[in-house]
């Protein structure tokens, strides 16, 4: 109970309060009630306050109003102040400069005025009018302090007595705070009571409510709005639940009223304000009841309100800062600790019974029993009894703390340590309602965070003395996803505030299905730290150049382990899609790009240079040592788990809203059918300087990926999973309309990567090395665009023999894989690929600039078989392809056997001559014993009279009025599923001699060694024969050099030099032998959709499965065999060109005759332009040997072998003009009956023939197709086109041509005379034709005779030791990779020591790669022909001079050798060698001069002949350079 207050002091206190009523302006006496006596009382009604005398720091009081105010003296000696309806309208006053201690000075001044007023003498008569009249003057005098300090103790005692007996109670308090933008916050307090009990000040507040509203200007007083009447223009929807207050008449001026906070009671007790010297507040105790915070309404407040509040708080904190005094020094603190002296605390206790935070209408957070106990010597603690989150009546949060507080904060002042601990495991069940409530809060807070600048927070300094640590127990989060639950378990978290570091051992993410829990992801050793100073980390950009990441937030993770299946991924996507739909509406608003500082380039000084690196600012950098992912396919269990590993990864969240991720090493593997397969792996494992994987996501959603130094694998066996998935495919369900997502673009770049493709059954591998590739993907719809620059193709025959690790340094991928065992087979130019998806159709366009292939016989077979086996084989048993058992048809099921039998008639006896029918059937079945292949010509085959007398028209069914199944349009087909367009501008295929594979070379060497051993072991000399790879035939005799024969056979050499090395030349030849060139090749593949019905529901229709159309504009085969002087093996016949757009057109269709049977058939149609062939026998033998090579390792054996059945084959008539040069005759084959060897006896020049149009039906396989065509075309040529062939035989060609000229001399005049009856003109025309034909042929005959004479002379000279034909090629060097060279050196022939001449060797064998000397090439005498007679004479003069120079040089060398000779025999030998050259060389020059002159004359007469000669004969290099000039 408070002490008694003397009456004089009581009156003085009342006088002071009345003096302070001076803030009332123009008080109306009608509203003033005064009661004097033993209990003096003053009552005021509806008084407007004069706000000019109110001074509150950083606050401007706009208006004030109080409805009722009573001041009275209590009989017990106290003073009561009672008020009702107190309203204030205030506005925050923000200024850059404010007083530092305004609040403290105002409080001290008020205490001093109160004390002085009570110490002054009272007037004798206390009348109300006098008090009011003198209030102002007395108040001014009271402000002067007493001059003497002797009364300080009395003054303090009087003040204490006065305050202890002062009671203030005000109800219905309303404070309205105005903000810019017509925003306001209103604070309502039901009652406020101030009292003192036992020297303890008590403040009780009841029914507190804080709300926000928007103000609407009054139409009557728009200019005076927000003035003194603004306090009555507030409408509060929450006041209906409050027991006080009435609504204002102008409540309609407020709109969008939201309650922000409600509190039922607030009880405050404190010590202090007892004297002038003691105005501090000590031992402050706060006790709150139930507090409701409406967070959803708070974040909906306009951002301008938050900006003002933040700045106001910042300035208020600056004003209340007190400079350090002695009691804050460390020495003073240590003294108080040693003396056990307790320091006065401002807040000693804080209690909240229940704190309820409303996130939405259904989700509420409840915090119960919050207590603060603050002691100086002992540890200060803050405890939280219980925390719950409720979704309606469902508890989402549970902390297993038992009876203990779930949350505790301990402050140890001695150790300067703060510990925040959670005393139980946290279980959080996240519901969809909770997520839908939390998402708008998060995005709104992010928006507020971006909009607020937090003015003044930079000046707030956090104490660094205390070490704050946060410790939690296990945190378990559960999120319902579909029918199951996604659970996250976070191990105890440790947070160091001083170090700004958060650490936890690991986080596990699991899938809870019924009672089963399975881990999906585990993250280990997570550490996240914030640094006050920026740190830098090395990173990379899109060009894989080094950059620097600058950030303050850094995290590290030891490992990330992912374990999931395809069903888990689908479950996550389907289950999380509702949550994504919740986030999507908030993602439409484009966030503001934060650019606190622009990216800069940083110069890094080194010892000898300056390195410029780009500097990128990041919000957070996360370093991950190791990422492992194990992905399994539940629907395809046989594929196994796909394990992926990424090492040394970095994840950066940049300030420009982009994301960067890169990893230095990427590996992937799987176990398929108990065999481990590699998916992708790094190529270079040592000295890796750039990341293997780089991913960057930009703000607009575009994703860019860079892959480097990685080999990607493809195994054909993986496609078996498609068959497995077909069996498990569920029935398609009708899907509801789904909104089309935004288009996503992904750009992938590959640098120094490789694609390794492995076939299904073979051990070979096809490798594509890519230096640079750009892949652009956009979805949806799925569109792909790929550009590859200069890919290189490599091939390996057996991957088990590859070198797995190469320690040597390598310059490029090609060199690396070459060392590993791969062979380079070709390269390509620019390759572009486009894939578009439209509806159910996929369109693939491939454009290739150039393809160059260089391949040998063994690698060619390996390549073809690998391409065939690059997909799983498809084969079916005969039961699925054909109807092996005829189905029984009950023909007589509904036939009445007695229908034609008369009633009463007995059954006739069975006839005994029914064998007549059997004889008829037996005699007639021979007519159908065999089905023959039908052949047709353009005019139709002549009708043939068969033995039975019937006349058959074989072309009846191929007439124009009957549709023929020549294209896919004849058959019904379904919609197109896939379309492939391939366009190759130029393709070159170079066929090399020799062998690429070590296995092939070792096999040949082993067989040769075995042959030599077998020959030496024979008792009687004999011949041993064997064959290899179906193309190499070997035999050995005791006197033969088997290795020399093998090299001759493999390298296409007829004669081997005597000094030939004993080592066989089995490696690929340095220069190609055959060059196949194709230009403007177009390929179109169309795959159609088809059904696979059963026999019961089948309609027995024919299905078109796919079709292929190939067009080639030009197709040429260039002859580069060393022993051949011809240039083009095959080219287009130019004089017969009919204007066809393509030289070759091929159409292939794959059909299924019966829809429910799996048997397929081919329909082939070919169109070929007229051909010009220059066939050299050596070249032909090389092509045959090349194409017949067969290695058993590459045989493809199907489970159910099948032969390609050709339903229909059609080829047009082909005009062929053939030149053939035989080299040798196989007499053994001729004796065996091979009549084709007779062609090797004749040389053909311009033999004309026509391969007539053929249509074949029912051909079993390509081999049978070749036999059928041969059996049709060969008899036709020998029967009806023998004259055209004989005209091309060289000895007969001139005679036939001259004979045709003589014939024209007679037939032409007769024909012309019959037409115009003019004898003279007819004779002139006949003579002109005769001269043109005979003169041209005589000139060509002269050329052949001169060239033949020159060849004889050159051979004779070479026989006597001269250069022979090599003299013409002395200056002709082979360009790189063009024509095969011949050596320039020859063996020396000793005229006196040997009488046996060496074998004629005009063409010296081609060396392999081991040879260092570049040989010369063989040039025909008909090559390098002059264009006209003038150039012919000029070249004749040059040829004659060159040969005379050679003869003169031989004589000069003989004279020099004779002078330096020791004996006469040596001198004679020198002259003997030079004599044949000296005599023969001038004759060779003369014959060559005649030949060149006649060639010039002939070419001038026939210009087209020169073009034909250039196509036929190889040109020398100097002649080609001359033409270019």
Swiss-Prot record:
One Pfam family linked to the record: ATG2_CAD
Disulfide bond annotation, renumbered to this chain: none
Keywords attached to this entry: Autophagy, Endoplasmic reticulum, Lipid transport, Membrane, Protein transport, Transport
Origin superkingdom: Eukaryota
Name of protein: Autophagy-related protein 2
Subcellular location, record wording: Preautophagosomal structure membrane; Endoplasmic reticulum membrane
Family to which this protein belongs: Belongs to the ATG2 family.
An MF annotation (GO) of this entry: phosphatidylinositol-3-phosphate binding
Membrane disposition: Peripheral membrane protein
Organism encoding this protein: Eremothecium gossypii (strain ATCC 10895 / CBS 109.51 / FGSC 9923 / NRRL Y-1056)
GO biological process, one term: piecemeal microautophagy of the nucleus
N-terminal signal peptide: none
């Amino acid at each position: 109970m408070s002490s008694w207050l003397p009456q004089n002091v009581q009156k003085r206190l009342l006088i002071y309060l009345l003096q302070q009523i001076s803030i009332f302006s123009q008080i109306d006496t009608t509203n003033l009630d005064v009661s004097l006596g033993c209990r003096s009382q003053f009552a005021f009604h509806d008084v407007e306050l004069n706000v000019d005398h109110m001074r509150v720091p950083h606050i401007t009081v706009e208006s004030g109003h109080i409805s009722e105010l009573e001041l009275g003296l209590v009989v017990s000696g106290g003073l009561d102040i009672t008020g009702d309806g107190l309203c204030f309208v205030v506005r925050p006053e923000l200024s850059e400069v404010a007083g530092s201690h305004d609040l403290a000075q105002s409080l001290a001044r008020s205490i001093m005025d109160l004390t002085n007023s009570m110490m002054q003498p009272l007037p004798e008569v206390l009348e109300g009018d006098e008090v009011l009249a003198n209030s102002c003057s007395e108040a001014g005098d009271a402000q002067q302090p007493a001059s003497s300090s002797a009364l300080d103790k009395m003054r303090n005692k009087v003040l204490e007595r006065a305050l202890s007996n002062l009671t203030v109670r005000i109800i219905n308090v309303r404070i309205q705070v105005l903000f810019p933008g017509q925003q306001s916050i209103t604070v309502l307090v039901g009652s406020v009571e101030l009292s003192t009990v036992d020297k303890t000040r008590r403040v009780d507040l009841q029914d507190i409510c804080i709300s926000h509203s928007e103000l609407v200007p009054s139409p009557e007083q728009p200019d005076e709005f927000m003035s003194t009447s603004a306090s009555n223009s507030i409408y509060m929807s929450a006041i209906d639940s409050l027991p006080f207050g009435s609504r204002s008449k102008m409540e309609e001026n407020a709109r969008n009223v939201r309650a922000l906070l409600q509190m039922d009671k607030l009880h405050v007790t404190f010590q202090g304000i007892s004297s002038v010297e003691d105005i501090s507040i000590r031992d402050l105790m706060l006790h709150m009841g139930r507090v409701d915070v409406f967070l959803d309404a708070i974040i909906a407040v306009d951002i301008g309100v938050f900006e003002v509040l933040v700045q106001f708080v910042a300035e208020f904190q600056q004003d209340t800062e007190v400079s350090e005094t002695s009691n804050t020094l460390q020495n003073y603190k240590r003294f108080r600790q040693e003396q056990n002296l307790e320091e006065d605390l401002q807040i000693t206790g804080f209690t909240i019974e229940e704190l309820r935070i409303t996130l939405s209408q259904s989700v509420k957070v409840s915090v119960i029993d919050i207590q603060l106990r603050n002691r100086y010597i002992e540890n200060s603690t803050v405890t939280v009894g219980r925390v719950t989150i409720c979704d309606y009546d469902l508890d989402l949060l549970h902390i297993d703390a038992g009876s203990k507080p779930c949350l505790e904060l301990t402050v140890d002042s001695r150790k300067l340590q703060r510990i925040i601990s959670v005393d139980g495991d946290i279980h959080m069940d996240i519901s969809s309602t909770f997520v839908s409530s939390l998402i708008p809060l998060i995005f709104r807070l992010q928006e507020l965070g971006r909009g607020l600048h937090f003015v003044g927070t930079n000046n707030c300094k956090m104490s660094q003395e205390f070490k704050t640590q946060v410790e939690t127990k296990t945190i378990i989060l559960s999120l319902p996803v579909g029918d199951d639950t996604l659970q996250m378990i976070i191990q105890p978290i440790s947070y160091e505030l001083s170090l700004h570091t958060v650490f936890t051992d690991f986080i596990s993410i699991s899938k809870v299905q019924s009672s089963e829990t399975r881990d999906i992801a585990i993250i280990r050793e997570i550490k996240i730290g914030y640094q006050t100073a920026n740190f830098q980390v090395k990173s990379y950009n899109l060009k894989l150049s080094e950059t620097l990441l600058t950030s303050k937030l850094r995290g590290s993770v030891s490992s990330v382990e992912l374990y999931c299946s395809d069903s888990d991924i689908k479950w996550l996507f389907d289950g999380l899609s509702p949550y994504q739909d919740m986030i999507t509406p908030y993602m439409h608003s484009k966030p503001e790009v934060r650019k606190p500082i622009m990216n800069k380039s940083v110069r890094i000084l080194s010892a000898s240079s300056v390195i410029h690196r780009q500097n990128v600012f990041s919000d957070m950098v996360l370093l991950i040592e190791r990422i492992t992912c194990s992905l399994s396919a539940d629907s395809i269990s046989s594929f196994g788990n796909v394990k992926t590993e990424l090492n040394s990864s970095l994840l950066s969240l940049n300030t420009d809203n982009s994301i960067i991720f890169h990893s230095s090493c990427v590996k992937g593997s799987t176990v398929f059918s108990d065999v481990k397969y590699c998916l992708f792996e790094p190529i270079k494992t040592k000295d890796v300087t750039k990341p293997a994987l780089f991913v960057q996501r930009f703000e607009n959603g575009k994703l860019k990926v860079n892959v480097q130094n990685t080999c990607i694998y493809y195994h054909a066996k993986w496609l078996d999973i498609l068959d497995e998935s077909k069996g498990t495919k569920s029935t398609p369900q009708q899907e509801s309309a789904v909104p089309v997502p935004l288009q996503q673009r992904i750009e992938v770049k590959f640098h120094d990567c490789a694609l390794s493709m492995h076939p299904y059954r073979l051990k070979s591998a096809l490798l594509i090395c890519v230096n640079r590739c750009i892949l652009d993907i956009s979805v949806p719809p799925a569109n792909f665009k790929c550009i590859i620059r200069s890919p290189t193709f490599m091939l390996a025959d057996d991957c088990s023999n590859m070198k797995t690790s190469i320690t040597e340094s390598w310059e490029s991928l090609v060199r690396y894989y070459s060392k590993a065992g791969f062979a380079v087979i070709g390269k390509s130019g620019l390759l572009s690929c486009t894939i578009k998806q439209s509806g159910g159709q996929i369109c693939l366009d491939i454009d290739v600039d150039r393809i160059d292939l260089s391949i040998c016989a063994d690698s060619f077979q390996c390549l073809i078989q690998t391409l065939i086996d690059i997909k799983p084989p498809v084969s079916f048993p005969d039961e699925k392809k054909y109807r092996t058992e005829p189905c029984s048809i009950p023909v007589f099921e509904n036939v009445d056997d007695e229908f034609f039998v008369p009633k009463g008639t007995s059954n006739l006896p069975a006839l005994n001559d029914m064998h007549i029918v059997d004889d008829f059937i037996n005699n007639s079945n021979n007519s159908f014993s065999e089905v023959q292949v039908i052949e047709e010509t353009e005019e139709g085959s002549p009708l043939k009279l068969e033995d039975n007398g019937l006349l058959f028209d074989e072309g009846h069914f191929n007439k124009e009025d009957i549709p023929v199944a020549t294209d896919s349009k004849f058959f019904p087909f379904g919609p197109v599923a896939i379309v492939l367009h391939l366009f190759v501008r130029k393709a070159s295929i170079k066929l090399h001699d020799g062998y690429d594979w070590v296995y092939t070379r070792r096999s040949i060497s082993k067989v040769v060694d075995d042959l030599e051993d077998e020959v030496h072991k024979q008792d009687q000399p004999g011949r041993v024969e064997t064959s290899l790879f179906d193309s190499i035939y070997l035999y050995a005799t005791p006197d033969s050099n088997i290795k020399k024969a093998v090299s001759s056979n493999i390298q296409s050499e007829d004669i081997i030099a005597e000094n030939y090395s004993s080592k066989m030349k089995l490696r690929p030849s340095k220069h190609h032998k055959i060059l196949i060139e194709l230009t403007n090749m177009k390929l179109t593949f169309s795959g159609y959709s088809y059904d696979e019905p059963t026999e019961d529901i089948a309609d027995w229709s024919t299905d078109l499965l796919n079709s292929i159309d190939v067009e080639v504009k030009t197709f040429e085969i260039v002859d580069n065999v060393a022993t051949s002087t011809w240039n083009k093996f095959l080219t287009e016949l130019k004089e017969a060109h009919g204007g066809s757009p393509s030289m070759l057109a091929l159409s292939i269709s794959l059909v299924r005759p019966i829809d429910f049977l799996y048997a397929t058939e081919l329909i082939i149609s070919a169109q070929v332009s007229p051909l010009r062939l220059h066939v050299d026998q050596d070249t032909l033998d090389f092509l045959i040997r090349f194409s017949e090579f067969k290695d058993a390792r590459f045989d493809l054996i199907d489970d159910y072998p099948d032969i390609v059945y050709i339903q229909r084959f059609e080829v047009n008539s082909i005009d062929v003009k053939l030149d053939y040069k035989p080299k040798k005759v196989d007499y053994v084959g001729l004796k065996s009956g091979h009549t084709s060897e007779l062609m090797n006896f004749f040389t053909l020049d311009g033999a004309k023939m026509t391969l007539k149009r053929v249509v074949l039906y029912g051909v079993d396989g390509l081999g049978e197709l070749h036999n059928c065509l041969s059996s049709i075309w060969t008899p036709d040529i020998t029967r009806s086109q023998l004259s055209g062939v004989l005209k091309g035989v060289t000895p007969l060609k001139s005679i036939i041509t001259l004979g045709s000229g003589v014939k024209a001399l007679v037939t032409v005049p007769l024909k012309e005379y019959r037409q115009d009856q003019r004898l003279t003109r007819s004779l002139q025309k006949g003579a002109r034709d005769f001269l043109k034909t005979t003169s041209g042929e005589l000139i060509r005959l002269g050329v052949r005779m001169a060239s033949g004479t020159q060849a004889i002379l050159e051979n004779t000279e070479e026989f006597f030791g001269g250069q022979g034909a090599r003299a013409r090629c002395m200056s002709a060097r082979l360009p790189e990779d063009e024509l095969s060279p011949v050596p320039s050196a020859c063996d020396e022939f000793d005229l006196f020591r040997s009488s046996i001449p060496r074998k004629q060797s005009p063409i010296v064998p081609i060396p392999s790669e081991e040879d260092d000397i570049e040989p010369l090439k063989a040039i025909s005498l008909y090559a390098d022909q002059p264009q006209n007679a003038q150039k012919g004479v000029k070249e004749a003069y040059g040829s004659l001079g060159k040969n005379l120079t050679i003869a003169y040089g031989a004589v000069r060398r003989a004279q020099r050798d004779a002078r330096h000779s020791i004996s006469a025999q040596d001198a004679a030998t020198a002259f003997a060698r030079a004599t044949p050259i000296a005599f023969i060389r001038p004759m060779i020059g003369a014959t060559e001069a005649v030949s060149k002159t006649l060639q010039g004359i002939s070419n001038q007469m026939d210009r087209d002949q020169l073009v034909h000669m250039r196509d036929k004969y190889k040109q020398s290099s100097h002649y080609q350079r001359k033409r270019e000039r």
